[in-house]
C-alpha cells in the first residue's frame, strides 16, 4: 500500500524519473487520475523535483518508518 513516507520506484516510461526511487509526499483520496505526489532528490530539466503519478505506476520499495513514541 502506497502511503505518505513510502519509498517508491517509478514505472512510467516517459517520466524523467523512470526506474528512480522517490518518497511519497501525499496521496489524494478524491478520485483524481494521478493522486500520488512523489518527491525526488534530483531535479529534472525544468528544476522540478516533484511529480504526480497514478498508483499503478508505482512499486513500493520501502514502507514508511514508524513514528517514535514519546
Curated annotation (Swiss-Prot):
Protein purpose: Stabilizes the interaction between PsaC and the PSI core, assists the docking of the ferredoxin to PSI and interacts with ferredoxin-NADP oxidoreductase.
Alphabetized UniProt keyword annotations: Membrane, Photosynthesis, Photosystem I, Thylakoid
GO CC term (a single one): plasma membrane-derived thylakoid membrane
Subcellular location: Cellular thylakoid membrane
GO biological process: photosynthesis
Membrane topology: Peripheral membrane protein
UniProt entry tagged with the keyword Thylakoid: yes
InterPro entries from the UniProt entry: Elect_transpt_acc-like_dom_sf (IPR008990), PSI_PsaE (IPR003375)
Subunit relationships: The cyanobacterial PSI reaction center is composed of one copy each of PsaA,B,C,D,E,F,I,J,K,L,M and X, and forms dimeric and tetrameric complexes.
Family that this chain belongs to: Belongs to the PsaE family.
Organism field: Nostoc sp. (strain PCC 7120 / SAG 25.82 / UTEX 2576)
Gene, per the UniProt record: psaE
Protein name according to UniProt: Photosystem I reaction center subunit IV
Amino acid at each position: 500500500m502506497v502511503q505518505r513516507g513510502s519509498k517508491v520506484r517509478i514505472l512510467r516510461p516517459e517520466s524523467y524519473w523512470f526506474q528512480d526511487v522517490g518518497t511519497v509526499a501525499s496521496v489524494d483520496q478524491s478520485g483524481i487520475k494521478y493522486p500520488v505526489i512523489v518527491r525526488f532528490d534530483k531535479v529534472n530539466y525544468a528544476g522540478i523535483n516533484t511529480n504526480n503519478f497514478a498508483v499503478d505506476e508505482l512499486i513500493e520499495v520501502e514502507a514508511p518508518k514508524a513514528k517514535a513514541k514519546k
